[in-house]
Amino acid sequence: MVLIRVLANLLILQLSYAQKSSELVIGGDECNINEHRFLVALYDVSSGDFRGSGTLINPEWVLTAAHCETEEMKLQFGLHSKRVPNKDKQTRVSKEKFFCESNENYTKWNKDIMLIKLNRPVKNSAHIEPLSLPSSPPSVGSVCRIMGWGTLSDTEMILPDVPHCANINLLNYSDCQAAYPELPAKSRTLCAGILEGGKDTCSGDSGGPLICNGTFQGIASWGGTLCGYVREPGSYTKVFDHLDWIQSIIAGNTNVTCPL
């Protein structure tokens, strides 16, 4: 009887995992074409490879994750379908890139942030509009929107033609500490996801925004080995903690340092 019960429990766990994986911009749907005017697609100029996403914060600047960096970057604005671009799509290249100290000085829990100055400003249009920086930090329990052209599967790289969106929850930092024991006691990151699994950012979604209660609060940074897995939420660079750094660089003070 005990053996039968153990086998039954194992079967339930397997079915539960299979369900979460299949639901796995894992677990989302195609974004509304009008809800991501600020979303930027990043490419490596030399290889043409897709590198992730960024957020347009004013006509000349894009905020993304440091680990999305390549030597020369192409940025596409007003993009929804990659195969059938919007008529108002605009393309720019990186003129300057700014990091916390260097493009290699970041970790899973600190300083995974990059500010890109464009070679020339973009113009607002039907599908292009900057997203404002936050005026206050987010609250645990907030409903947050994730989006990107990242893989739809955690077992193989399946990049969609259009960005996918999903709603997740802003969690306590302790939830990420429980999942990832290597995390320090404090971090300038946000912990977000669905603890029951099923919705998550994944490979290719890096650098994209975490929008909590309508406000830009985080930058997709990293997560568990499997996307959308139970009790393995994602980590997002906390935008609010880097406001002084961002605003100082945009104002021309490039000697400013990131918060410790």
From Swiss-Prot:
Q: What is its main location?
A: secreted
Give the Enzyme Commission number.
Answer: 3.4.21.-
Q: Which residues form the signal peptide?
A: 1-18
In which tissues or organs does this protein occur?
Answer: Expressed by the venom gland.
- Which enzyme class, named as a word? hydrolase
Instruction: Give one Pfam family.
Output: Trypsin
UniProt-annotated catalytic positions? H67, D112, S206
Cysteine disulfide partners in this protein: C31-C165, C100-C258, C144-C212, C176-C191, C202-C227
The UniProt GO MF terms for this protein read:
serine-type endopeptidase activity; toxin activity
The residue ranges of the Peptidase S1 domain are 25-251
GO cellular component, alphabetical, reads: extracellular region; secretory granule
Keyword annotations: Disulfide bond, Glycoprotein, Hemostasis impairing toxin, Hydrolase, Protease, Secreted, Serine protease, Signal, Toxin, Zymogen
* Compartment annotation: Secreted
Return the CDD domains for the record.
Tryp_SPc
Does the record carry Transmembrane helix as a key word? no
Q: Which GO terms describe its biological process?
A: proteolysis
User: Which PANTHER family does its entry note?
Assistant: KALLIKREIN-1, KALLIKREIN-RELATED
Description of how the protein assembles with itself and partners: Monomer.
Q: What is this protein called?
A: Snake venom serine protease KN14
Organism equals Trimeresurus stejnegeri (Chinese green tree viper)
Lineage at the top is:
Eukaryota, Metazoa, Chordata, Craniata, Vertebrata
